[in-house]
Amino acid sequence: MTATPRFGVNYTPTRGWFHHWLDFDLDDVRADLDSVAELGLDHVRVFPLWPLFQPNRTLVRPRAVEQLVALVDAAGERGLEVNVDGLQGHLSSFDFVPSWTTTWHRRNLFTDPEVTAGQAEYLRTLAQALADRPHFLGMTVGNETNQFSSDPHPDPDRITEAEAAEWLRRMVAACEAGAPGRTHLHASDDAAWYADGHPFTPAHAARIGAMTNVHSWVFNGTAQRHGPSATATEQHAAYLIELAKPWAEEPHRPVWLQEVGAPAPHVPPERAGAFTTATVRNALDCPDVWGVTWWSSHDVDRSLADFPELEYDLGLLTNDRRVKPAGAALAEAVAELRQSWRPPRARTTALVLHGADGSGGRAACAPGGAYFEAWMRLAADGVRPACVLAEEAADAERLAARGISEVVEPRDVPPTPQRPGPRG
């Protein structure tokens, strides 16, 4: 990719959080989006709440859809393009699923024919309503909907890998039916990359939808294990971007870093700016990155109860729209990168990944796993590592297409960084 990467934010309304759809105020939305645009960002990701938009399986509320269109138009008036998440789904520790899928109407979210037909119609309806808006980027099927399919969810809708793939393809196709030619994709949390046996897989992420999507959160054990300023913490997003690539059928499939944030106390507030700058720069040292979308635009109003503590302060701006250190750091980095952007050179050294689709393979990729730790030792040693599956490590044509000239086995990575000059 030679185009300058996109820089955006996940929009968290200042008044009422995502419950603002119940008391929708376009003036509040406009003020929020003004404060986002002032940071120099170019897009937002927005979140309808599924139960509010589709309270009955055969009812997608026209007024709710009109409000979504008004929000998207307000963003466009401020030079912001918009990605819309459909099935919300899961947000900041809360689940939002409609009553027609729970309790007396309990049905599997991924396999019940009536539920999946209702979901597809909902996604098609939202996409169709926005299809003629030039500032509409496309749909994301939902926010980390994979969380509903397996542990540690308290009430999972269990499915197989094949059923997950079928569901994803159907939902992406529904988005395409509503808005042909836009950028439609799906999003998982890092269980897809790190959890053995999870039904949503790296191959699903890298082969279904218009681009691959990663969400990077260092509260997953990375910062706890390595510390807030360690290579592993500041390179976690870059690692996920590179880990996403080997499964792609196209060697230069775009990868979107769709969520990344500075969660306290794992990243102390006094380090939030430095962490933001390092994370963005490291992510953009990976080839084929479509863009970086920070979580989130504004802090959560502390008058709202029961959020995990770290969720309240993830904003680039405060709840009263004042720029925080992370927001200032991102704005400065964006301005500089737009002026000086050059596509990163290929990562010529790749770490070989064994058994990633089998028992133990994905766990090795997680923080503390043998593959994760070897990759981070290489990164700390000045190498710019890529990732390659064992089955393609001897495929000269595939390696050449990705710009890889050297492959390294995890067992051959020294246990302690040696500090030569940068390689790869």
Which residue stretches match the model-derived regions?
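Glycoside hydrolase catalytic-domain groove-lining segments
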Residues: 162-165, 179-265
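Active-site mouth of glycoside hydrolases
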Residues: 2-209, 292
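Aromatic-rich peripheral "rim/lid" segments of glycoside hydrolase catalytic domains that contact
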Residues: 119, 286-424
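Histidine/acidic-residue-rich catalytic or RNA/ligand-binding cores of hydrolases
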Residues: 266-280, 303-311
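Structural motif
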Residues: 39, 78, 250, 286-287
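Glycine-rich beta-alpha junction loops
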Residues: 143-145, 218, 296-299
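Charged helix-capping and loop-helix junction motifs
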Residues: 60-68, 234-240, 272-278
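Generic hydrophobic alpha-helical scaffold/packing signal
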Residues: 245, 280-284, 331
